[in-house]
């Protein structure tokens, strides 16, 4: 019999004080920010890498595709390692690999070497979601875990926002190799901070289990039989396709659709990211006060989908398009903490790392597929359809969220 957690109990040696919770949330958020920073260290340097290695845009794009494929596959596997050996050691190894990947990229003299660096970065990135969420679930009190998820999401957005600024600034004033060497300092510095505070993020003791059995006495792969787990995977896959379209082509589509300058279109994307961070902050409050996170997700994504379709209609002036991008980011951000609470409720006991690893591999899969799909739309000169399909994918995600909530509540009633 597989049981799920609606509220994972805190271990007795971790008192639920505000200071303890805030410390854990800050440390995990710091690590997650590094992960998202590394999502874009290569993309931010494409302008320099293209002439330096005489590469096509397809070859540059393949570097990112390989990064996310390695990260997605590794993420699913990392969840098993987290549950077997503990989240802290796995998190430390991932951060270390990110630093090594930047150093490897900085010394690359061939496309193959760049590919190796991208693969190392993907391996390092793969551990963060299963490790981060396991630590948050184990070390943060139930009353404040929604705020932990909120900060976790915001820190990721900050990493996304800072990477292009930092990498392009250093590469412009010095060299792209120096930019990568400077980027390597970040994970090694954060690793030192985490090591000095390692007691705060210590894992729960891993119970010995018979071969083929999870720590809780259930089969290691039993959680894969839960429909809610695969609905969560589908939710992340679908929403990540939409996110991939926004990240890769929203600015270009706005230029074509509204006739605005590239600078204003870039500002619209910035508005999306900043508003998303604000939405995550508000979403933490909403999630903490709600007992049905799937409904919060459904409402937020309904609004985001309608706004995306409105943006596609080009019935507002250019400044209105910027505002709509911000509104889409805000509503999508509100859904973030409730989304993570939804997964937490669906996760079987003692399988947190495995569930988050499999579920979040859907995010990397969607981010790998999204740019290919939306790139084809843009090659066909269909900027309006880009936003229409972003809305369609967000609407499709609603069905998976409602399905997860229904399955989780049914399982809870059956257990009762």
Can you name each region flagged by the protein language model?
Residues 40, 68-76, 160-161, 273-281, ...:
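Residue-level signature of mid-helix packing/kink "hotspots" within the transmembrane helices
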Residues 73-109:
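Conserved MFS/SLC helix-loop-helix module at the cytosolic interface between two early adjacent transmembrane helices
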Residues 74-86, 280-292, 378:
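Helix-to-loop junctions at the C-terminal end of transmembrane segments
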């Amino acid at each position: 019999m597989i049981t799920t957690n609606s509220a994972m109990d805190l271990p007795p040696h971790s008192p639920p004080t505000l200071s303890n919770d805030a410390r854990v949330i800050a440390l995990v958020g710091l690590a997650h920010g590094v992960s998202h920073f590394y999502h874009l260290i290569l993309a931010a340097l494409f302008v320099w890498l293209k002439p330096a290695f005489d590469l096509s845009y397809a070859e540059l794009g393949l570097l990112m595709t390989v990064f996310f494929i390695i990260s997605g596959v590794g993420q699913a596997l990392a969840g098993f390692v987290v549950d077997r050996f503990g989240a802290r050691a796995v998190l430390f190894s991932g951060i270390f690999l990110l630093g090594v990947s930047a150093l490897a990229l900085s010394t690359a003299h061939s496309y193959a070497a760049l590919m190796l660096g991208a693969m190392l970065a993907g391996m390092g990135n793969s551990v963060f979601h299963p490790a981060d969420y396991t630590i948050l679930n184990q070390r943060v009190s139930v009353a404040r875990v929604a705020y932990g998820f909120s900060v976790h999401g915001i820190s990721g957005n900050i990493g996304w926002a800072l990477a292009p600024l930092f990498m392009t600034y250093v590469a412009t004033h010095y060299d792209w190799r120096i930019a990568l060497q400077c980027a390597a300092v970040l994970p090694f510095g954060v690793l030192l901070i985490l090591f000095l505070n390692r007691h705060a993020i210590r894992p729960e003791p891993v119970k010995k289990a018979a071969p083929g059995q999870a720590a809780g006495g259930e089969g290691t792969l039993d959680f894969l039989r839960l429909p809610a787990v695969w609905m969560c995977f589908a939710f992340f896959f679908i929403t990540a396709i939409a996110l991939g379209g926004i990240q890769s082509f929203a600015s270009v589509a706005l230029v074509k659709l509204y006739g605005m300058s590239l600078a204003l279109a870039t500002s619209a994307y910035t508005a999306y990211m900043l508003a998303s961070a604000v939405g995550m902050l508000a979403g933490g409050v909403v999630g903490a006060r709600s007992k049905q996170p799937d409904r919060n997700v459904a409402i937020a994504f309904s609004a985001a989908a309608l706004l995306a379709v409105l943006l596609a209609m080009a019935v507002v002036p250019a400044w209105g398009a910027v505002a709509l991008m911000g509104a889409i980011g805000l509503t999508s951000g509100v859904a973030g903490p409730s989304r993570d609470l939804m997964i937490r409720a669906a996760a079987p006991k003692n399988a947190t790392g495995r569930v988050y690893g499999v579920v979040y591999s859907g995010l990397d899969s969607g981010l790998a597929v999204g740019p290919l799909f939306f790139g084809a739309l843009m090659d066909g000169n269909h900027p309006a359809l880009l936003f229409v399909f972003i809305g369609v994918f967000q609407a499709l995600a609603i069905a998976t969220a409602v399905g997860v909530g229904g399955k989780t509540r049914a399982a809870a009633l059956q257990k009762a």
